[in-house]
Structures are given as structure tokens and as C-alpha cells.
A protein has these predicted regions:
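N-terminal subdomain of nucleotide-sugar transferases
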Residues: 1-49, 218-221
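Short His-centered aromatic/hydrophobic patch
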Residues: 92-98, 117-118
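Conserved donor-binding/catalytic core segment of Leloir-type glycosyltransferases
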Residues: 5-7, 193-211, 217-221, 229
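Membrane-proximal helix-turn-helix segments that form the acceptor-binding/catalytic region
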Residues: 79-80, 107-108, 137-160
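Short hydrophobic beta-strand element within catalytic cores of glycosyltransferases
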Residues: 280, 289-292
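A charged, aromatic-enriched C-terminal amphipathic alpha-helix characteristic of glycosyltransferases
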Residues: 36, 324-359
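Aromatic "clamp/platform" in nucleotide-sugar-dependent glycosyltransferases that forms part
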Residues: 272
């Protein structure tokens, strides 16, 4: 009997946690596969009332485990539950301690281990060491040790799945002896809402320097006659100098965030580097045009990539000048997103994970 386990740091609806696109993607893929095989999603939580519980969401079993102070301690916590379930396949996305759990599942249970990349830098060597070196020598040492474990685990994966051509190229270069496949992000179809009467631009993301929230503030100053909405949390010092036409919401429930995205005229993404941000795809499925400073979206007819702030400003000005342009482009983007990130992506993930396709 096939029994599938999906590993994720947090449930995407966990209000006590710091949620990323990886958490949402693992959840979406686990929900899809639960329609075909017994599927278990293992997540950690800071909500003590949920720790130890198994809650069924549709056909998906969600296991809530204790969230330890140090990430490396997730390895024994998650591995213990995996050994109890005895899965035939373990899926994990992004570079974390859970990558090690996936590899140990293969070693101890002979489970198939599939690893999926998130951002491009996740394929690099010693990612955690570079990140933690800014926070002191002790944390850098632990980061180095965790990085070594993760790298060993990545090399032991049965299959590596990339989400775009750039990632596939990096993965093929690093894991030249492995099979590399590409599956784009999987999306549910969100509810749609009527556009705001006034031209409105939205930005959604973490308030980190690599997300460049300051650029969105500069855009708001460039278009004082328009409304600018910002949803996210993190270092609010980065957006201290925001103008009066920019409204900051902080952290919102996902449903409320999607409502704002759907009602806005344009979504702007200013991140330095990402895979395929979920928020971009969600905007497309809501019928909201997207302009991205650095991120490319492959497989669709419309080019969301700007590459230069002057180009972004020019294209934004053109869209904000006409509600009809926004609505027409939004409908075209929605059709493309439905085809690529709902229909084709669904079939791709089923081919990758369900037997007999996953014979490596």
C-alpha cells in the first residue's frame, strides 16, 4: 500500500508561524495527492493546544509536532513520526533540517525521497553558513554543521524537482548524476472580487532587504494620485519613510490578502531573486496584472519581467491610466495561469509522485 509523507516546517494557515511559499506549496501538493493515495502532512507548530494532534483535512492527515527552539532539533522530532507512519515516499521542499529527515527516511525505511527546490540559492552549497555568519560565530558553526547534513541529504535524494529553467540548470550542474525534473508551482483557484474604483497597486511579502520593499515606497511617491497597499511583516524600519498614499496592513489572514490582491489594479513584485512567487500566480488567477522587477514567470504568453525600475514605472503608468487595460490584461493572464499553474501543474505533480511514474 502506497503511503505518502509530506514534510513542511509549518501549516500555511498557522497564525503563530512565519509562513513562506514553500509551506503553501507543500500543502497544496499534499492535498492533491491525498485524492489518490493515503497522505500525511507533518508540520511543526508554536500552538501548544495542537501539538501531538492529527487533524484530517478532507482526505489529508495533518500531524502537528512541537516546534523546537533550534531548527536542527526538528530532525529527531519529525523522524520519529515518519518512522511510525512507515511511508513508501517522502516529499520535502526547500533547504532545511527537514531535508535531512527525508534522506534518513530513505536510509532507514527504503522510502523514495523526492526533494523540490524553492528559491535558486537553495541549490547552492553552504547557504545556512552564509546566512548565520552574520549572527555570531556559534550560530555560524551550527549553520555549517546543518549545511553539511543538508548537502549529504540532497545528494541522496532519488529525484530533484525544479520549478523553473534557471533552477533546473543549476540542479543539473550540481547533481549531474541525478534525474532532474521540472514542475511549476501548483495553485488553487482563488475567489475573485470587483476591482477598486481608484487605481490601486499592491505589494505582498516579507519585509526583508532582499524583497526590496523600499522600491515600492518610491513607487508610491512616484504616483501620489494612486493608492498603494502593502501586506507583510518583518523589519518595519525598511518602510518607515512611507508616504500618505501607502497603507500598510501588516500580517493578514490569507483570505483577506487574496481579497486585496483581487481588488487591486496591479500587483508589483520587487524581490531580488525567487523561484516562482506564489503571490504572483495568485494575482494572475485573480485577474490582477503583475509587474515584476527581477522575477521571470515561464510558460505564459505575457512577460511580467521588467528588469529595470524605469521600465517598471513606464509599464505601471500605462496600466494605471486605463481600467479597461487592467481588466483585459487581467483576463488574459488568468487564462494563462489556469492553463499552466492549475491544469498542467496538477498533471505534472501527479506524474512525478504517483507510481509507476516515480521509478527512478
Amino acid at each position: 500500500l502506497d503511503r505518502l509523507v509530506f514534510l513542511s516546517d509549518f501549516h500555511p494557515n498557522d497564525e503563530s508561524a512565519f509562513i513562506t511559499g514553500s509551506h503553501l506549496q507543500v500543502y497544496q501538493i499534499a492535498k492533491l495527492l491525498s485524492e489518490y493515495r493515503e497522505s500525511h502532512l507533518l508540520v511543526s507548530t508554536n500552538d501548544q493546544s495542537k501539538v501531538g494532534k492529527v487533524i484530517k483535512e478532507g482526505e489529508l492527515f495533518v500531524h502537528y509536532l512541537r516546534n523546537p527552539r533550534y531548527e536542527i532539533l526538528k530532525i529527531p522530532i519529525f523522524l520519529k513520526r515518519v518512522l511510525e507512519i512507515e511511508p513508501t515516499l517522502v516529499f520535502q521542499r526547500g533547504r532545511s533540517a527537514l531535508t535531512v529527515v527525508g534522506f534518513l527516511s530513505k536510509v532507514l525505511l527504503s522510502s523514495t525521497f523526492i526533494w523540490s527546490s524553492n528559491a535558486q540559492e537553495g541549490i547552492d552549497f553552504l547557504k545556512y553558513t552564509r546566512f548565520l555568519s552574520r549572527k555570531g560565530k556559534i550560530r555560524a558553526i551550527f549553520g555549517f554543521l546543518l549545511d553539511l547534513l543538508i548537502n549529504i541529504s540532497l545528494e541522496g535524494a532519488d529525484l530533484v524537482v525544479a520549478q523553473n529553467e534557471e533552477q533546473r540548470g543549476k540542479a543539473e550542474e550540481r547533481f549531474w548524476w541525478k534525474e532532474i525534473r521540472m514542475c511549476k508551482n501548483l495553485q488553487e483557484i482563488p475567489e475573485r472580487f470587483e476591482k477598486f474604483e481608484k487605481p490601486t497597486v499592491i505589494w505582498v511579502g516579507r519585509l526583508d532587504e532582499n524583497k526590496n520593499p523600499k522600491i515600492f515606497i518610491d513607487l508610491a511617491k512616484e504616483f501620489p494620485e494612486c493608492e498603494f497597499l502593502m501586506v507583510g511583516y518583518g523589519n518595519e524600519e525598511l518602510i518607515r519613510d512611507r508616504p500618505g498614499n501607502l497603507k500598510f496592513f501588516g500580517k493578514l489572514p490569507r483570505e483577506e490578502t487574496l481579497r486585496l490582491i483581487s481588488s487591486s489594479w496591479v500587483l508589483v513584485n520587487t524581490s531580488e531573486s525567487e523561484g516562482i512567487p506564489n503571490v504572483i500566480l495568485e494575482a494572475m488567477l485573480c485577474g490582477t496584472p503583475v509587474l515584476s522587477l527581477n522575477v521571470r514567470v515561464e510558460g505564459i504568453a505575457y512577460n511580467v519581467f521588467c528588469g529595470d525600475i524605469k521600465v517598471l514605472i513606464e509599464r505601471l503608468r500605462n496600466l494605471l491610466s486605463s481600467r479597461e487595460k487592467v481588466l483585459n490584461l487581467g483576463e488574459n493572464l488568468r487564462r494563462e495561469a489556469l492553463r499552466v499553474f492549475v491544469e498542467e501543474s496538477r498533471e505534472c505533480w501527479l506524474r512525478v509522485i504517483l507510481p509507476p511514474y516515480n521509478t527512478f
